[in-house]
Amino acid sequence: MKKTYLLNSEISEVVARLGHTDLLVIADSGLPIPDGVKRIDIALTKGIPSFKDTLNTVLTELGVEKAYIAKEMIDKNNDLYLYLLELFGEKLIIISHEDLKAMSKNARAIIRTGEYKPYANIILESGVEF
């Protein structure tokens, strides 16, 4: 049995296959998932699992070079914005929600959570751990 923190086999496989600058999206329950992008749907019910729990678990195994969020989060979900700003610092890049949706078309996968708060979406750009 796997000993590390991340137990979901689909997410673990995607993270293991990411190369430098590959994109992984962690999304709320409402973000559209483009055709052709792998969907990992872990939503169970409203709020479960949460965006934060999912993100924090993924970060136990993924080195992040940059993280992209929608500028709309600043006003519509400020607590989450402040949390992400503290977590990522200068690695956090603010873009429009439309640009975030366009970028998600290039993601290796989108993890759909049960998050029910607006604009709780992030694109993680894989870094290099050496």
Swiss-Prot record:
Substrate binds at D28, H97, Y119, A120, N121. GO terms for molecular function: D-ribose pyranase activity; intramolecular lyase activity; monosaccharide binding. Its main location: cytoplasm. Keywords: Carbohydrate metabolism, Cytoplasm, Isomerase. The keyword Cytoplasm applies. InterPro entries: D-ribose_pyranase, RbsD-like_sf, RbsD_FucU. GO terms for biological process: D-ribose catabolic process. GO terms for cellular component: cytosol. It is found in: Cytoplasm. It catalyses: beta-D-ribopyranose = beta-D-ribofuranose. The active site is at H20 (proton donor). Its EC number is 5.4.99.62. Pathway: Carbohydrate metabolism; D-ribose degradation; D-ribose 5-phosphate from beta-D-ribopyranose: step 1/2. The keyword Cytoplasm applies. Belongs to the RbsD / FucU family. RbsD subfamily. NCBIfam families: PRK11797.1 (NF008761). Homodecamer. Catalyzes the interconversion of beta-pyran and beta-furan forms of D-ribose. This is D-ribose pyranase.
